[in-house]
Design a protein with these regions (language model features):
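Divalent metal-dependent phosphoesterase catalytic cores across multiple superfamilies
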Residues: 4-204
Length: 204
């Protein structure tokens, strides 16, 4: 079935998914005209985001932010980057490019909704990794590495399964409510705050 194929592919690619610590997160700003960007990078640099109403990025405005040292994983140091974009207009299609690890990343798309009337999705407690100690339908014991980042497969099964279900829930919710402006997750987002693999699954 399509679902079993999706699950098989998720398991096969989980090592790659869970070690991708550089996803970009977008969150609402202080008001409707602002948008916050946050991401990890491996390079000490000034974080930048370029934004334009043109897909080819003509006339783009560049915003800079702040960077701090975040975590070290497998001897690799990661930096936390935060940038706020301002001056956004309602009901407008934008294109943006994040500057990460010394290069501009692929251009992405973002559309603002009406400022005075909008809807959003509210979810709670994805808590990636919380299924630890349970036994899966495939008779696997769900283990969790706690506040430790490890590549050992048997220590990441809880995060793997929870992330898969979380992604499915989000995709289905957004398919059913494609007009929402944003999503609010009340938390807990992950089971262990220092386990970056759980965050990778949450953001993936």
């Amino acid at each position: 079935s399509q679902e079993s194929t999706k699950w098989s592919n998720w398991k096969k690619n989980w090592a790659s998914y869970s070690s991708q610590y550089e996803h970009v997160s977008l969150t609402p700003g202080a008001d409707e005209t602002k948008l916050n960007y946050a991401w990890y990078s491996k390079t000490a640099e000034t974080p930048k985001v370029r934004i334009s109403t043109k897909q080819n990025m003509d006339g783009a405005t560049e915003f800079t932010g702040a960077q701090t040292e975040a975590v070290t994983i497998d001897d690799t140091k990661y930096f936390s980057n935060k940038v706020t974009v301002s001056g956004l207009k309602e009901n407008t299609a934008y294109y943006y490019q994040v500057f990460q690890d010394g290069a501009g990343q692929d251009t992405q798309h973002y559309t603002t909704q009406a400022f005075d009337e909008f809807s959003f999705l509210y979810v709670g407690d994805p808590q990636i990794g919380a299924s630890k100690g349970q036994t899966s339908s495939e008779n696997e014991k769900m283990e969790n590495a706690g506040n430790v980042v490890t590549s050992a497969p048997e220590k990441n099964l809880a995060a793997r399964n929870d992330s898969y279900n979380w992604n499915n829930v989000l995709n289905e919710a957004l398919e059913d409510h494609s007009d929402v402006s944003f999503l609010v997750s009340a938390g807990d987002q992950v089971n262990y705050g220092s386990n970056e693999r759980e965050y990778a699954g949450y953001l993936g």
